[in-house]
Amino acid sequence: MLSAFLLLVGCSGDKQEKNMSITVNLRYTGVNGNAKKFAEEMVSRGTVDAIRAEKGNLRYEYFQSLDDPETILLIDSWADQEAIDAHHATPMMNTIAELREKYDLHMTVERYTAVETPETENKFIRK
């Protein structure tokens, strides 16, 4: 089933995804609005801005599901695996883990590697 998502937090600005970038989709699920509270606290603490400023970060955006108010989608894109590894080595990962525990969130993770859009698909893309 295809879920619809509503943008919850502004985009990371003028960063563009490049070939071979890695995008990680994390779905946070909780109860009583905890997933949204988690995302809001990530923003209010400045953690989101700090992640967006990290070398190699291309995108860090939260979206709220239109058909499941207890789910928040994080789209997190990086230039390469080295950038992800550097991010995972930062102290802010402890902050993120503590917030996940605070809000009792459960996660599913999907990981994608960017490739060029085939020419045959360009006719379906409205720019």
Feature locations, PLM:
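Short, well-ordered beta-strand segments in beta-rich or mixed alpha/beta enzyme
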Residues: I22-T29, R59-M92, E110
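Short amphipathic alpha-helical segments
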Residues: N34-L58, M92-I96
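Glycine-rich beta-strand-turn "strand-cap" elements at beta-sheet edges
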Residues: D14-N19, E61-E70, T95-K127
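C-terminal motif of bacterial Sec signal peptides marking the signal peptidase cleavage site
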Residues: L8-G10
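Sec-dependent signal peptide recognition
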Residues: M1-L2
